[in-house]
Amino acid sequence: MLKGQLAGLMKQAQAMQDNLKKAQDELALIEVEGQSGAGLVKVLMTCKHDVKRITIDPSLLADDKDMLEDLVAAAFNDAVRRAAATSEEKMGKLTAGMPLPPGMKLPF
């Protein structure tokens, strides 16, 4: 009986590993957009933090360079937060019901 339980646990662990890999692959394809300056600067990135595009409204190009740099940084940070929230939501569905310690995130 113990051998059967161990085999079942190993099968569950393998299925979980496969599901995590699939979720990670899906996250690499999901794109989120961060914005700043009421949408004047936008950063499009995947949930794996690969930046795909930065869009800057032409009206900002004649403005202060420091302000533009701040807006780009703010849009990037907004995109990172959105990617993290999307990743957490996606992975949370996989780990629902698992006895993980508080604050522990998957993948490790």
Curated annotation (Swiss-Prot):
Signal peptide bounds: none
Compartments where found: Cytoplasm, Nucleoid
Region (Disordered): 86-108
Recorded superkingdom: Bacteria
UniProt GO molecular function: DNA binding
Pfam families named among the record's database cross-references: YbaB_DNA_bd
Regions crossing the membrane: none
Keywords: Cytoplasm, DNA-binding
Stretches assigned to coiled coil: none
GO terms under cellular component: bacterial nucleoid; cytosol
Compositionally biased spans, kind Pro residues: 99-108
Family matches, as SUPFAM superfamilies: YbaB-like
Primary localisation category: cytoplasm
Its biological purpose: Binds to DNA and alters its conformation. May be involved in regulation of gene expression, nucleoid organization and DNA protection.
Family to which this protein belongs: Belongs to the YbaB/EbfC family.
Self-association state and partner proteins as the record states: Homodimer.
UniProt-listed HAMAP family: DNA_YbaB_EbfC
Protein name: Nucleoid-associated protein Mpe_A2533
Species: Methylibium petroleiphilum (strain ATCC BAA-1232 / LMG 22953 / PM1)
Source taxonomy: Bacteria, Pseudomonadati, Pseudomonadota, Betaproteobacteria, Burkholderiales
